[in-house]
């Protein structure tokens, strides 16, 4: 009889644990609001993406006299390394 009451007690405890886990409210995930992306291409002004170059500031150029710039060398379309200096 003692074994039967222990088995019933264990079954009740397990049932109670299962009920507690199934009734727990799940943590709601915070949904990050994302800005809708527009398909419009926004043109940047040339002054904002051309790299300024001053001959007195040698730290902006590499030892070979080349530098990275955009549309600053002849026959260059886009950005790249220019060694005309």
Swiss-Prot record:
Might you name a Gene Ontology BP term for this protein? Answer: defense response to bacterium
Tell me where on the tree of life, at the top rank, the source sits.
Eukaryota
User: Disulfide bonds, which pairs?
Assistant: 66-83, 69-72, 70-79, 73-82
Q: Where in the cell is it found?
A: Secreted
Record's note on what induces expression: By bacterial challenge.
Q: Which GO terms describe its molecular function?
A: hormone activity
Name the propeptide positions: 25-64
Query: Hey, what tissues is this thing expressed in?
Result: Predominantly expressed in liver.
Q: Which GO terms describe its cellular component?
A: extracellular region
> May I ask which residue range the UniProt record assigns to the signal sequence?
1-24
Q: Which UniProt keywords apply?
A: Antibiotic, Antimicrobial, Disulfide bond, Hormone, Secreted, Signal
Query: What function is annotated for this protein?
Result: Seems to act as a signaling molecule involved in the maintenance of iron homeostasis. Seems to be required in conjunction with HFE to regulate both intestinal iron absorption and iron storage in macrophages.
Q: Which family does it belong to?
A: Belongs to the hepcidin family.
Name of the protein this chain belongs to: Hepcidin
């Amino acid at each position: 009889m003692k074994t039967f009451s222990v088995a019933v007690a264990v079954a009740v405890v397990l049932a109670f644990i299962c009920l507690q886990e199934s009734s727990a409210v799940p943590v709601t995930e915070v949904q990050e609001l994302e800005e809708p992306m527009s398909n419009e291409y926004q043109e940047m002004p040339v002054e904002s993406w051309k790299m300024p170059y001053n001959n007195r500031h040698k730290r902006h150029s590499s030892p070979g006299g080349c530098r990275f710039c955009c549309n600053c060398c002849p026959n260059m379309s886009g950005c790249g390394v220019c060694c005309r200096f």
